[in-house]
Design a protein with these regions (language model features):
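Short beta-strands within extracellular/lumenal beta-sheet-rich domains
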Residues: 24-28, 283-296, 333-336, 417
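Surface beta-strand/loop "capping" patches
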Residues: 34-36, 281-284, 521, 525, ...
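Ser/Thr-rich low-complexity repeats and stalk/linker segments
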Residues: 19, 25-103, 358-360
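Beta-strand-rich ligand-recognition modules
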Residues: 57-81, 310, 317-370
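An acidic-aromatic loop/edge-strand motif
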Residues: 94-164, 195-277, 347-417, 421-426
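Aromatic-lined ligand-binding clefts that engage carbohydrates, nucleic acids, or primary amines
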Residues: 266-267, 293-321, 350-352
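Short, aromatic- and glycine-rich surface loops/edge beta-strands on solvent-exposed regions
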Residues: 81-91, 351-352, 614-620
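C-terminal beta-sandwich/jelly-roll accessory domains of carbohydrate-active enzymes
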Residues: 566-654
Length: 654
């Protein structure tokens, strides 16, 4: 067990005037993992032993503080039950009340895990769900978002600590986490504690410790940068300002485009929106967007606001050649102030240098109002409409962009340091993980990153706990013909992790996504499928926990016979029609849609265009049209029988 160091600024327990101070992990309404030796730690100003009395067995445990007052002991927890209390005393006792013993699950990842029951996102039937959200045996602990360059032992929690599950407390809590916990509480008849530690728009490498991430050659430099980063914000800002100055000098040498006027190489496109046109479809790098407007006389020498909404991915924005703002990350709304000294009557040019680091680029804007420049709420000029746009420097030719170490949660290791490390070694049953949209463009690299994270966390906890992955759901417009797909490659990376790691599972979500929304609303089904894995593998239920999985195949002439496992009572389709989503290729490696037939636990494939088949793919698309499932209507996992190099092979930029 690692040494626990508790900072003096940890939350004061509000149960009296004791000198003992505890983490938000140890508050009223907490849940402790059943039948284990659970650690309890804190800090005291005294030099003598701290006593911990557990009401379930009336046993007293003693812990000697070290020279700095830090203490830790382990208490033996019974089978699920409660409520109980824990009394901790260094001379003045404090009591943690309404403690339940049950199952504790950590819920982590990016925005689809952070997606609330009702808040910035809204789940399916959210109002009805909130009406029925009072669950005495479900407790919630929500870690506040924060990032630090070095491992922390303290954190802040929403509401200060554990909260009873209610319409009020669960509204802003992870929907996937809540629905998962509800399924476990109902089916296993145990109290459930849920810890949410998630942050939207974050890559997996932000959640890995520097100890582990530094072992990957792709991240040695980035990890060392964070290790060298000062902790205090003013010094960190100075550090970053120097990095940006150096970066801009390097970039100017290769991209000397005017920031005032567009030129003849520009084309006209409508904004706001993503640039999905063929010219930009496969381009990552620098894209310039220009808009000329007329500033009225009444606005002269007055401060203005430029409201651009979200931009994909990073931007530097100019007004008449002057930098007025910059921001990294597509999930942030841009609102930039324009200095009154820059504002003159007449023509003015807004120039935006977008750095696209993956997927489509664009000025995404707002859902409910125009992008605009404004004097005040009553006086604004819409910027919706035609912009002059051109691409310049591909990403591969751009010097590495330093990430803002104060505001950019994509920085390596920083979320582990601030949002995971402080939870260790609190006893947990396992982890559910919904993350990956931010790593899609590096799917092959993810084959190494996700297993690394799992090993990292298991080592820190000294516990090979179960780890269940939510496979990315279908997203983007459907494609008419078979082709390559970064999202399919990413799902493959997730599936390979589950295949090759012990006590790891993956829930297939290929049928419950939304073509137009990266945050599908049906979080109940996401959670149900994750809970099926836990119920089958950790709680001993004899249930079908997943959909069909490709096992092997036989080629017979111009036909291919595919064999599947996890078929329950046999293969079927979700809509009762012939299986769709299968593509077949011959020696030329060109895929065609296949004719299909189900026979028991096999699917027979053929195509008149492929006389000598050598490879099969199923659901191999961002948003595939597929329908094969088992008798429980759980979908078949996407797969391919080939190992031909994919679109993301070799992508390491982050």
């Amino acid at each position: 067990m690692r040494t626990i160091i508790i900072a003096l600024s940890l939350l004061y327990c509000l149960h009296g005037q004791s000198e003992v101070r505890l983490s938000p992990l140890f508050t009223d309404n907490m849940v402790m993992q059943q039948t284990t030796d659970a650690p309890i730690w804190g800090i005291t100003n005294t030099k003598h032993a701290v006593s911990i009395i557990t009401s379930w067995d009336k046993k007293t445990y003693n812990a000697m503080p070290d020279k700095d007052g830090h203490f830790i002991t382990h208490v033996s927890t019974p089978k699920a039950g409660g409520p109980y209390s824990i009394t901790i005393s260094d001379g003045t006792p404090i009591t943690i009340d309404n403690v339940l013993i049950g199952e504790v699950w950590l819920c982590s990842g990016q925005s689809n895990m952070d997606f609330p029951v009702k808040g910035w996102g809204q789940t399916k039937n959210c109002d009805e769900e909130l009406k029925n959200a009072d669950h005495y045996r479900i407790r919630l602990l929500h870690v506040n978002n924060t990032m630090r360059p070095h491992a922390q032992t303290e954190f802040e929690a929403v509401g200060g600590g554990w909260q009873l599950c209610s319409a009020e407390t669960v509204a802003g809590f992870s929907a996937v986490g809540y629905f998962f916990g509800r399924d476990i509480e109902l089916n296993e008849n145990v109290p459930v504690g849920l810890i949410e530690s998630a942050w939207g728009g974050t890559p997996v490498e932000a959640w890995i410790s520097s100890e582990f991430l530094s072992t990957m050659s792709d991240f040695k430099k980035a990890t060392q940068r964070i290790i060298n980063m000062p902790d205090d914000i003013p010094t960190r800002k100075h550090f970053y300002d120097e990095e940006i100055t150096s970066f801009e000098k390097q970039l100017k040498n290769i991209d000397d485009n005017s920031v005032i006027n567009a030129d003849e190489t520009c084309n006209r496109y409508l904004l706001p929106g993503l640039l999905t046109q063929k010219e930009f479809a496969d381009f990552d790098g620098i894209i310039w967007c220009y808009k000329t407007i007329g500033i009225p006389h009444s606005w002269q020498n007055k401060e203005l606001k430029l409201r651009l909404g979200m931009i994909d991915d990073n931007d530097v924005t100019y007004f008449n050649g002057k930098v007025i703002g910059r921001m990294d990350g597509y999930a942030e709304n841009r609102v930039y102030s324009i200095n009154a000294d820059f504002v003159k009557e007449g023509k003015a040019t807004i120039a935006i240098r977008i750095m696209d680091i993956g997927g489509y680029a664009g000025i995404v804007g707002y859902k409910d109002h125009d992008i605009c420049i404004e004097l005040d709420a009553e006086n604004s000029i819409s910027l919706n409409g035609e912009w002059l746009i051109k691409k310049t420097i591909p990403l591969a030719d751009i010097p590495e962009l330093p990430r803002n170490p104060i505001t950019d949660a994509k920085n390596v290791c920083m979320l582990y340091n601030a949002m995971i490390n402080p939870l260790v070694p609190f006893s947990i049953k396992g982890v559910i993980w919904y993350q990956g949209e931010d790593n899609v463009n590096r799917a092959y690299q993810y084959r190494e990153l996700l297993p690394l994270l799992i090993e990292d966390w298991r080592k820190q906890w000294n516990n090979r706990f179960p780890f269940y992955i939510a496979q990315l759901a279908n997203y983007h417009p459907k494609q008419k013909e078979p082709g390559e797909s970064k999202w399919a490659e990413f799902r493959e990376a997730q599936h390979l992790t589950a295949k090759h790691k012990d006590n790891v599972g993956v829930a297939c979500l290929i049928d419950i996504g939304d073509a137009n929304d990266i945050h599908p609303a049906n979080k109940q089904e996401v959670a149900r499928r994750l809970a099926l894995l836990a119920r089958a593998y950790n709680y001993g239920e004899q249930i079908e926990s997943s959909g069909p999985v490709y096992n092997n195949h036989v080629i017979s002439g111009d036909k291919v016979i595919l064999h599947f496992i996890n078929t329950d009572k046999g293969l079927t389709t979700s809509d009762g029609k012939t299986p769709r989503g299968f593509a077949i290729a011959g020696l030329d490696h060109k895929f065609y849609w296949a004719e299909t037939e189900i026979k028991g636990n096999t699917v027979i494939l053929w195509s008149p265009k492929v006389k000598h088949p050598i490879a099969i793919r199923y659901a191999w698309a961002d948003n595939p049209d597929c329908n094969l499932c088992n008798s429980k209507l759980l979908p078949t996992y996407p797969f391919r029988t080939d190992d031909w190099p994919g679109m993301t092979l070799g992508n390491i930029a982050y």
